[in-house]
Curated annotation (Swiss-Prot):
Keyword field: Antibiotic resistance, Disulfide bond, Hydrolase, Plasmid, Signal
InterPro entries per the UniProt record, alphabetical: Beta-lactam/transpept-like, Beta-lactam_cat, Beta-lactam_class-A, Beta-lactam_class-A_AS
Signal peptide bounds: 1-21
Protein name: Beta-lactamase SHV-13
GO molecular function, one term: beta-lactamase activity
Length: 286
């Protein structure tokens, strides 16, 4: 009898961790939704197994914004692997091909850019004209959506080009994904045989080299942690990030966070995403 009581006491002693530790990131997300007066979608997924660790509105649609550029470059790399494209191929373009926010491509009107350089510009600097030039090589928005269907993503869709795809109208399914679908697609691109090992390394390196994500999860990342990410921003308060991160400089988990329909400023949106990232990391370290 005494042995049974000791077993029960030991079991009860473990319950507070099981009950109180897990919801902590979700509590942060609920607070963020309240403070933003908007919606948050999030998923934390184990990279190796694909198991969902934390989720909130993970199956609701959110604007992709510039996070689609990771998938776009994944589609480009798939064409490279198939022998239909070369990262060294030079693409020339004109002034009329440039759209708003093209910090890299606008400097190369005279000499053009290679496909690889365009992917680097699209991911590391979120260059919109670079994205459009690449999008043309995969068949436009319809071609990228077809690629998504081919790799098993039946949810994510791209319907328009930069910069119209950032309209983010309430209830509009165009140019949207769900946190769960985006995480699963990113995992396929980086771990399955959809891309060669070389192309997987290249896609990941472009994300590691992201130069416009500083105020988000990177701002709360502990020393020695790995991060590779791509951010996005759009009208009507939309903001987002797709990221791989983990301790010991190793990618272990995928984190996708999307915001929409909030009147908050960009700085406030960045702060809330950083707060959610910090909560996930703190929970991870327990």
């Amino acid at each position: 009898m005494r042995y049974i009581r000791l077993c029960i006491i030991s079991l009860l002693a473990t319950l507070p961790l099981a009950v109180h530790a897990s919801p902590q990131p979700l509590e942060q997300i609920k607070q963020s939704e309240s403070q933003l007066s908007g919606r948050v979608g999030m998923i934390e997924m184990d990279l190796a197994s694909g198991r969902t660790l934390t989720a909130w509105r993970a199956d609701e649609r959110f604007p992709m914004m510039s996070t689609f550029k990771v998938v776009l470059c994944g589609a480009v790399l798939a064409r490279v692997d198939a022998g239909d494209e070369q990262l060294e191929r030079k693409i020339h373009y004109r002034q009329q091909d440039l759209v708003d926010y093209s910090p890299v491509s606008e400097k190369h009107l005279a000499d053009g850019m290679t496909v690889g350089e365009l992917c680097a510009a699209a991911i590391t600097m979120s260059d919109n004209s670079a994205a459009n030039l690449l999008l043309a090589t995969v068949g436009g928005p319809a071609g990228l959506t077809a690629f998504l269907r081919q790799i098993g993503d039946n949810v994510t869709r791209l319907d328009r080009w930069e910069t119209e795809l950032n309209e983010a109208l309430p209830g509009d399914a165009r140019d949207t994904t769900t946190p769960a679908s985006m995480a699963a697609t990113l995992r396929k691109l980086l771990t399955s045989q959809r891309l060669s090992a070389r192309s997987q390394r290249q896609l990941l390196q472009w994300m590691v080299d992201d130069r416009v994500a500083g105020p988000l999860i990177r701002s709360v990342l502990p020393a020695g942690w790995f991060i590779a990410d791509k951010t996005g921003a759009a009208e009507r308060g939309a903001r987002g990030i797709v990221a791989l991160l983990g301790p010991n400089n190793k990618a272990e988990r995928i984190v996708v966070i999307y915001l929409r329909d909030t009147p908050a400023s960009m700085a406030e949106r960045n702060q809330q995403i950083a707060g959610i990232g910090a909560a996930l990391i703190e929970h991870w370290q327990r």
